[in-house]
Amino acid sequence: MTTRKPFIICDFDGTITMNDNIINIMKTFAPPEWMALKDGVLSKTLSIKEGVGRMFGLLPSSLKEEITSFVLEDAKIREGFREFVAFINEHEIPFYVISGGMDFFVYPLLEGIVEKDRIYCNHASFDNDYIHIDWPHSCKGTCSNQCGCCKPSVIHELSEPNQYIIMIGDSVTDVEAAKLSDLCFARDYLLNECREQNLNHLPYQDFYEIRKEIENVKEVQEWLQNKNAGESSLK
């Protein structure tokens, strides 16, 4: 029987980082109107693309440096993430960060941890009076949810047939990707969704837990054994 190669995708805000950076930006800089937009996204009466786009549209572009400095100082990387990335790199397990966040904070926060070509996120433009969001990874094919950064579309683009897909996330932006995964590591909003929709999942608090559980996954164990056997035969 052919071994199913593991393939890991990971959210950024609230998953790799301890808090949701977009929410913290809005709490600090946005006028009160952002709350109704957030509630619309969470209740799914607004698409993620529309809701998040309109939230950032409330912020003057003149705040670029202030917002950037704030989020880079405020964000904290979740415990065990650096070690987790080192583990998957050592064993050559495909790993991508697919984020509904913005390039001006996702890239610098992951610098030196995850290569830029393994990060998919949105682009914030500060060229006009108010921040405008560009969506370079919009929905394709059968997805019509107006995801913004469409995680299902990116998964279809990057993954190969018969891979064992592992999803790590926390929020409403991760639900559709979780439905495509063989195993979802979930917390917060996503954990409740996984329970309600009977998706195969495990809860987590940090990446030490995730690594421990991943090493117990049959497909990962088989991949590591085959890889180690191949390396031994070359010695």
Curated annotation (Swiss-Prot):
Enzyme class: hydrolase
Pathway stated in the Swiss-Prot or TrEMBL entry: Amino-acid biosynthesis; L-methionine biosynthesis via salvage pathway; L-methionine from S-methyl-5-thio-alpha-D-ribose 1-phosphate: step 4/6
EC number from the UniProt entry: 3.1.3.87
GO molecular function, a single term: 5'-nucleotidase activity
Keyword S-adenosyl-L-methionine: no
UniProt-listed PANTHER family: PHOSPHORIC MONOESTER HYDROLASE (PTHR28181:SF2), UPF0655 PROTEIN YCR015C (PTHR28181)
Protein name: 2-hydroxy-3-keto-5-methylthiopentenyl-1-phosphate phosphatase
